Amino acid sequence: IFNVLSKKVRLEKRKKYLHVALNSTLEEAGEIISQLPASDRILIEAGTPLIKIYGTEAISRIKALAPAGTYIVADNKCTDLAAREVEMMANAGANASTCLGVAPIETIDSFIEECQKFNIDSMVDMMNVESALEVLKKLKKLPNVVMLHRGVDETEFSTEKQIPFYQIKQIKGNYDVLVAVAGGDTIREAQRAVFNDADIVVVWKNFYQS
């Protein structure tokens, strides 16, 4: 099971990335991927709905559809049994796996450790976390990526919920990690993420159809 260890593409701190989330069907994923330019700065995500529908095959299928060497994110949103989940995502071909910041600290610690073991990047998704710094302070090791995330339902049903752009500089001023921003549906929000020094901007269907 460890034959994947030497083949993984990893993120680099000096680069900025566009992260394209695919959440609908594999057919639609193929259509979107075919329109993307080949670039080491484009990350392609097997979204949570795809993984729930197709299992880990969603990851391997998206990897097959994308140009060789494309960085694939498995958005499994781990909340428990981190060792098992990371192994599954890595063996399916993912370059990164996600864990929720609201998960038990023990789970996040295990998740980060297992990602290191399988030579994939760890992404901790801070959706519904008031302060990412407070979570990071409790961890034994840092993840590769901290994701500030306003959820789809939050965006749709709450006009008051804002993406915490101010936390980007707080996190990067205290920790040597990459910061991703997810949940922006407009070009303006993507621009704000870049202006505030986000390393990764996550977009999904609503964004690139606008």
Feature-to-residue mapping (PLM):
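C-terminal helical cap(s) of enzyme catalytic domains, especially alpha/beta-barrels
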Residues: 1, 111, 194-195, 204-210
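Conserved N-terminal beta1-alpha1 strand-loop-helix module at the mouth
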Residues: 1-73, 78-83, 141
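Conserved anion-binding
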Residues: 12-14, 81-174
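Structural preference for beta-strand elements that scaffold enzyme active sites
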Residues: 15-19, 41-45, 71-73, 95-96, ...
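Glycine-rich beta-to-alpha transition loops that act as phosphate-gripper elements at the mouths
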Residues: 22-26, 74-83, 125-130, 178-188
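Well-formed, non-transmembrane alpha-helical positions, independent of function
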Residues: 35, 61, 88, 138, ...
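Glycine-rich, proline-tolerant flexible connector loops at the mouths of alpha/beta enzymes
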Residues: 42-58, 150-157, 205-210
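Short secondary-structure boundary segments
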Residues: 48, 101, 126-127, 150-151, ...
